[in-house]
Regions:
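Rossmann-like dinucleotide-binding core of oxidoreductases
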Residues: 59, 68-202, 271, 325, ...
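C-terminal active-site-capping segments
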Residues: 342, 346-446
Length: 446
């Protein structure tokens, strides 16, 4: 019976929905809170050892499981910068993902490091309550309007009839992305150079019109293609910089150190602050614990990650981003090679969850104890992912999707093949098509 109140609901409403689901399906009894997985190890046929750290009493325990699903999410491990002297700061400081609920920002001198999605939400939310807000920008960000609105009556009726998921799926599968009604686009248009260039011109003009100071407007205008990096879907971001208490710092060398009273810049400038908010993103690399499969092979080994490359996924090899060979009964939700930067992740999770549940149930009925992908199926999917990135706009700048561009390869850097760069519809067609009649060509059961 839950119906969202508007198009973009708040964190509180999303949390309420999660609570509703937990109570509706009576699964709270099965949830272990303040328990951190520190290692997964395949120990025997049909058996995984799960090492768990209790964060309350700092003790370690272990359980054994037949199937393991990693649903921790790729954007769940906050990445803090490594500025010298961070421990010296006398004021309050925290990452946006670990927001200090006790922090009182009213009337304070606040600095925020970063201009990504989290930063933009914070900037527009707190500008009116702080004494001053200094935004430390490394890279400008494209933004489009979301024009939030209450859930319309026809959608409410669709919810009541149980058809809203189908409506969402239709919009997503058709490749329509309508958050800004004044700028609709399709998946194909996004990668058309002429179309993209025209959109950049349009959005640049919007920034000029929104920002009173021409110099600030210039600094807030990106120099890379639309959607090459994650785009902000937010209202009032640029106009917030017209407020007298909001200041933009765009030092090319960025922050170099933290001292007792604030941030030191490469230019030598010192910005005195009472609160520092780090909106510095997430470590979107490997699952944040060791996963060891057959014969001691680790997930890091499978994905080409090592200490030399800061354990980034250089060349993940999976089937649909869900299965990894030599890792029987191991499944990843929203894993590498399963989504692109405009994927509707909610729908992806729904379909992957259904796939895993159906697979495990069918194995039980068929008296099968293990499943893993065939090596040839993994190679085939990885090859498809490699080809899928050709011609895509995401290759034209350095971003967390690709971990480097084609040009970087000449300097010895390998761009990541960590995503399925075709449409979400095409991914689901592969997943559902493989699940409905081609399993013997893709999966090995025992």
């Amino acid at each position: 019976g839950f119906i969202p109140s508007k198009r973009y609901v708040s964190q509180t409403e999303i949390a309420d929905y999660a609570e509703l689901l937990v109570d509706h399906f009576d699964i709270r009894q099965h949830i272990k809170f303040l328990q951190k997985v520190v290692a997964l190890e395949y120990v025997d046929f049909g058996k995984w050892r799960v090492e768990i750290s209790n964060l309350e009493n700092e003790t370690n325990t272990e359980i054994f499981a037949k199937h393991v699903v990693c649903a921790n999410g790729p954007l769940s491990s906050p990445r803090m910068p490594e500025f010298g002297g961070m421990e010296k700061f006398k004021g309050e400081s925290f990452h946006t993902a670990e927001w200090d609920q006790e922090a009182n920002l009213k009337g304070k001198k606040v600095g925020i490091v970063g201009t990504g999605a989290s930063a933009a939400q914070v900037i527009t939310s707190i500008a009116d309550e702080v004494e001053s807000l200094t935004v430390f920008q490394r890279t400008a960000t494209w933004a489009i309007e979301r024009e939030d609105q209450p859930t319309p009556p026809d959608i409410v009726e669709a919810f009541k009839a149980g058809g809203y998921s189908s409506k969402l799926r239709y919009v997503d599968w058709k490749g329509e992305y309508p958050p800004d009604p004044n700028l609709p686009f399709t998946f194909e248009q996004l990668h058309d150079k002429n179309w993209n260039s025209a959109v950049c011109d349009l959005l640049s003009e919007r920034i000029k019109n929104d920002v009173n100071d021409p110099e600030v407007a210039k600094l807030l205008t990106p120099d890379y293609p639309f959607f090459c990096k994650r785009v902000l879907i937010i209202d009032d971001y640029f106009t917030t910089f017209n407020k007298e208490n909001v200041h933009l710092v765009n030092d090319p060398g960025g922050v170099v150190a933290v001292n007792e009273t604030g941030l030191e810049m490469s230019s030598g400038d010192l910005h005195e602050l009472e609160v520092i908010i780090y909106a510095t993103g997430f470590d979107a690399g490997l699952i944040p614990f060791t996963v060891t499969g057959k014969n001691g092979i680790t997930l890091a080994d499978k994905f080409g990650a090592s200490a030399e490359n800061n354990f980034q996924m250089i060349e993940p090899k999976t089937l649909w981003g869900l299965h990894v060979n030599d890792m029987p009964n191991f499944y990843m939700m929203v894993g590498p090679q399963s989504l692109n930067p405009v994927t509707n992740v909610t729908l992806l999770c729904e379909e992957q969850g259904k796939y895993i549940a159906k697979l495990v149930s069918s194995m039980k009925l068929d008296n099968k104890d293990e499943v893993e992908p065939l090596a040839k199926a993994v190679k085939n999917w990885t090859d498809k992912c490699n080809v899928s990135s050709d011609g895509k706009i995401w290759l034209q700048c350095n971003n967390w999707y690709m971990k480097g561009t084609k040009d970087d390869q000449s300097a010895g850097r390998s761009r990541s093949k960590a995503m399925w760069m075709e449409s979400h519809e095409s991914y689901l067609n592969h997943l559902l098509g493989g699940a409905d009649g081609h399993q013997d060509e893709l999966l090995k059961f025992s």
